[in-house]
């Protein structure tokens, strides 16, 4: 591999802003903020808005959209135009 072309890949702690959940992983992201981890070492801290701990898809709090109502609304609005264009 070529030297000096790859970014610095190091341990980083990511923190979910809404839940406070933290996890240690590796990343090229950097930060001036640090946090002491469970192993006693200090790591850069990156605060993110959404993680799997707070995203509706992963928490099971997602909403099911009313697709039938949206299709009917589309048909009412554009249905006649499409039929006339085919003739």
From Swiss-Prot:
Keyword rRNA processing listed: no
InterPro entries assigned to the protein according to its UniProt record, in alphabetical order: Ribosomal_bL28/bL31-like_sf, Ribosomal_bL31, Ribosomal_bL31_B, Ribosomal_bL31_sf
GO biological process: translation
Pfam family, one: Ribosomal_L31
Source species, domain of life: Bacteria
Similarity-based family: Belongs to the bacterial ribosomal protein bL31 family. Type B subfamily.
Subunit structure: Part of the 50S ribosomal subunit.
Name this protein carries in UniProt: Large ribosomal subunit protein bL31B
Record organism: Corynebacterium kroppenstedtii (strain DSM 44385 / JCM 11950 / CIP 105744 / CCUG 35717)
Name of the gene this protein is made from: rpmE2
